[in-house]
């Protein structure tokens, strides 16, 4: 999320960024966040002042107790005791007020955090402006799309000819959006994953198998609430979610951690099964394995200094293109427009592979 200090000092920039992402309903949240931050800081400042006063009063009682112990004059003793009692009463009043301020601070922080989670990151100045993916911009093509002079069979038809897939059994066992892979098709699936793994290792990346379930606070750190509700499966009765991509647990690994500069960059390639609620919505494509609830993926993760992030961004998408081209698959790079960017992203591109059967 954005730093509240940045939001407080640059409200106009934050609001303009929200407009660029066509999320005008979020504009009032900027002022709400600033107001909550002011409440939070006021509670902190007053609490610190009261704490200092409490310490001063408590310290003042020490000499008074010493005088009280040595004093023989009853009138003077009564006066000293009166001062001690007054100090104790003030300390108690301070403690009560500090407890109230702590509660107010906690409430303001909780409300502020909820808002900050939905205020989008400031997008890169090179991101094209548009409301949705129809405004994504094609940047470059790699390889020439080929149109065969014969009708290309549907992918599941090919797999069924080799007895390599069983969608009916998967439907009975798990419902739509699942499949069994069998025999050589299953082996081919594993071979492609292994190739992608070794491809990234050869680029100097460290192979990692992460946890496949993560806590809710980690989910909040890697995706918006809307994306979370639309994608993640929650484990009933547990503070655990099945990951939608290993990116979730890999980024979670470094959340709130301080990494020495000499340990950067960290270049990791991670394998995991991925679990998502999404369902097919493209007619005949629903009977295939395009949009499914469970699949496996090889991911690229780089943890680096902010000033190096642009260079690594360029390297990562070029690695993706190179991998596809090694299979002689034509691809194109699409620059995601502002409205298509997830709120946590500053810049992103899609690498789309050519489908001879779909002709797109």
Where are these regions (language model features)?
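TRNA-recognition modules of translation machinery and tRNA-sensing kinases, especially anticodon-binding
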Residues: 27, 141-360
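N-terminal alpha-helical targeting/anchoring segments
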Residues: 1-145, 160, 164
């Amino acid at each position: 999320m954005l730093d509240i200090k940045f939001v407080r000092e640059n409200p106009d920039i934050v609001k303009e960024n929200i407009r660029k992402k066509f999320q005008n309903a979020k504009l009032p949240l900027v002022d709400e966040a600033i107001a909550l931050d002011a409440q939070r800081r006021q509670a902190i400042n007053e609490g610190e002042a009261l704490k200092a006063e409490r310490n001063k009063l408590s310290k003042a009682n020490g000499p008074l107790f010493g005088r009280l112990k040595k004093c023989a004059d009853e009138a003077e003793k009564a006066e000293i005791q009166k001062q001690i009692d007054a100090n104790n009463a003030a300390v108690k009043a301070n403690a009560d007020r500090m407890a109230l301020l702590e509660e107010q601070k906690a409430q303001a922080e909780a409300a502020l955090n909820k808002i900050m989670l939905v205020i989008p990151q400031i997008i890169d100045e090179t991101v094209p402006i548009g409301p949705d993916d129809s405004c994504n911009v094609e940047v470059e093509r790699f390889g020439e799309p080929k149109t065969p002079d014969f009708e290309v069979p549907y992918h599941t038809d090919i797999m069924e000819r080799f007895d390599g897939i069983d969608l009916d059994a998967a439907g009975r066992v798990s419902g739509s959006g699942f499949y069994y892979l069998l025999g050589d098709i299953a082996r081919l699936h594993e071979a492609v994953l292994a190739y992608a793994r070794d491809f990234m290792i050869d680029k100097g990346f460290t192979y990692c198998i992460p946890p496949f379930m993560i806590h809710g606070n980690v989910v909040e750190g890697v995706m918006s609430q809307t994306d979370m509700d639309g994608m993640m499966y929650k484990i009933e009765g547990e503070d655990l979610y099945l990951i939608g991509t290993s990116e979730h647990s890999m980024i979670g690994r470094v959340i709130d951690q301080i990494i020495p500069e000499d340990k950067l960059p960290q270049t990791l390639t991670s394998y995991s099964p991925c679990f998502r609620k999404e369902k097919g919505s493209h007619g005949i494509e629903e009977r295939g394995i395009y949009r499914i609830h469970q699949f496996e993926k090889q991911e690229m993760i780089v943890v680096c200094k902010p000033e190096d992030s642009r260079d690594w961004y360029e390297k990562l998408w070029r690695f993706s293109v190179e991998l596809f081209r090694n299979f002689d698959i034509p691809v194109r790079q699409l620059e995601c427009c502002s409205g298509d960017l997830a709120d946590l992203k500053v810049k992103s591109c899609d690498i789309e592979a050519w489908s001879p059967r779909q002709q797109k």
